[in-house]
């Protein structure tokens, strides 16, 4: 196989398969490095750790501009004047996201986690109360936009993005198209960075195992079990309860239909945006109101973020527990909901929720360097985490739309 063909295969093949290869090679490198050290004169696993460091730096670089342009584009291009039960559907989106945050917090406190971090800052300044968190949030909102982008002040970035998005809703269509083109360009850069994930995972796993030993794998396995368990609980317990509250009959036939059609496809595409056509077809098959689902499903792909709420909450609280920062459950729920809401606009990007972790971490006084390591941990487990998160997010879009439409139909027939 020539070099160009190898490069094409590696960069255009399945990302999941490539990450698995990087993960396996990282483990193998860590295992054989001690035996090779007398021959090479250095520990190979420690040296390849530079690949992981560069990957983390790339993630930190793209995260601020990614959130900025995607949120502007999402708000500026939002359709105006459509009713069609949207208030009820958006309310379910909000309830679902908040419920996911609660599930994630309870799971994190019930099964405390430790994740291996290479460096831990000594100058942590965790908030002492909810009121202090509000002070931090409000002060960060009024930051200079350029400074916010340069310093990764995600709250300030979000505030300016929302304000600009609202202002641009009344701009000329050509301006909105330009904003969309910019968002698409940034997304392509993000995909380029994420395409390097196998190299980054290879370096991160090798260096982590060389430093922490094989026991670090259990830390990742524990974290993954908490994440997936929370998402499954949300999909199979909380969501059916919400649907039953709306339609007043057995919700599981509808839940299974949405999971088997929408969730299964989204699991492999790992993109809520890419799964929109599947959800549209399913909504049509279910006989839902076209005026409603044609708006609610694309909107849900942007703002319905139950899976992201779980991911950001669990990983952030894992970092909090690792660093020994005391935090009450109400404060954890508040901060987790804030971070989940900030995920708006990033759901169409594979791994997008991971890039929001620095926002939640910053509210606990955790430094950007440590937050970037938490993102890297997320990519290590992302083969299943991101796929399951997307499956939950996307299947819930059509599930809640169907629930509201069926409830309206039941009301009209009563």
From Swiss-Prot:
Keywords assigned: Amino-acid transport, Cell inner membrane, Cell membrane, Membrane, Symport, Transmembrane, Transmembrane helix, Transport
Function noted in UniProt: Involved in the import of serine and threonine into the cell, with the concomitant import of sodium (symport system).
Membrane topology of this protein: Multi-pass membrane protein
Entry's Gene Ontology molecular function annotations: neutral L-amino acid:sodium symporter activity
Lineage: Bacteria, Pseudomonadati, Pseudomonadota, Gammaproteobacteria, Pasteurellales
Protein name per its UniProtKB record: Serine/threonine transporter SstT
Annotated gene: sstT
Similarity remark: Belongs to the dicarboxylate/amino acid:cation symporter (DAACS) (TC 2.A.23) family.
GO cellular component, one term: plasma membrane
Organism: Actinobacillus succinogenes (strain ATCC 55618 / DSM 22257 / CCUG 43843 / 130Z)
């Amino acid at each position: 196989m020539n070099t160009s063909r190898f490069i094409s295969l590696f960069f255009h093949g399945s990302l999941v398969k490539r990450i698995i290869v990087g993960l396996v090679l990282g483990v193998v490198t860590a295992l054989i490095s001690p035996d090779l050290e007398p021959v090479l004169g250095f520990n190979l696993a420690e040296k390849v750790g530079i690949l992981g460091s560069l990957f983390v730096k790339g993630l930190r670089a793209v995260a601020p501009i990614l959130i900025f342009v995607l949120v502007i584009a999402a708000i500026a291009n939002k359709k105006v004047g459509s009713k069609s039960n949207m208030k009820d559907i958006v309310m379910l989106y909000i309830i679902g996201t908040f419920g996911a945050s609660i599930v994630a917090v309870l799971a994190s406190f019930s099964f405390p986690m430790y994740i291996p971090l290479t460096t831990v800052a000594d100058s942590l300044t965790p908030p002492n109360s909810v009121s202090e968190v509000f002070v931090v949030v409000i002060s960060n909102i009024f930051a200079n936009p350029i400074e916010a982008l340069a310093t990764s002040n995600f709250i300030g970035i979000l505030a300016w993005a929302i304000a600009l998005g609202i202002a641009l809703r009344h701009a000329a269509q050509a301006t909105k198209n330009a904003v969309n083109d910019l968002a698409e360009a940034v997304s392509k850069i993000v995909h380029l960075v994420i395409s390097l994930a196998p190299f980054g995972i290879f370096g991160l796993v090798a260096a982590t195992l060389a430093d922490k030993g094989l026991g670090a794998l259990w830390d990742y396995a524990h974290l993954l079990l908490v994440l997936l368990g929370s998402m499954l609980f949300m999909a199979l317990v909380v969501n059916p309860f919400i649907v039953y509250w709306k339609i007043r009959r057995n919700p599981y036939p509808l839940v299974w239909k949405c999971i088997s059609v929408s969730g299964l496809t989204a699991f492999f595409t790992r993109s809520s945006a890419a799964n929109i056509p599947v959800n549209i077809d399913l909504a049509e098959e279910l006989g839902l109101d076209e005026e409603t689902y044609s708006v609610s499903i694309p909107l849900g792909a942007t703002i319905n973020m139950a899976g992201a709420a779980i991911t950001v909450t669990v990983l952030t609280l894992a970092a909090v527990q690792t660093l020994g920062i005391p935090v009450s459950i109400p404060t954890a729920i508040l901060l987790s909901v804030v971070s989940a809401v900030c995920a708006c606009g990033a759901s169409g990007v594979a791994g997008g929720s991971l890039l929001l972790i620095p926002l939640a971490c910053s509210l606990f006084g955790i430094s950007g360097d440590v937050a970037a390591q938490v993102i890297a941990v997320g990519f290590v487990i992302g083969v299943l985490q991101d796929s399951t998160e997307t499956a939950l997010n996307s299947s819930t879009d059509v599930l809640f739309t169907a629930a509201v439409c069926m409830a309206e139909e039941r009301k009209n027939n009563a």
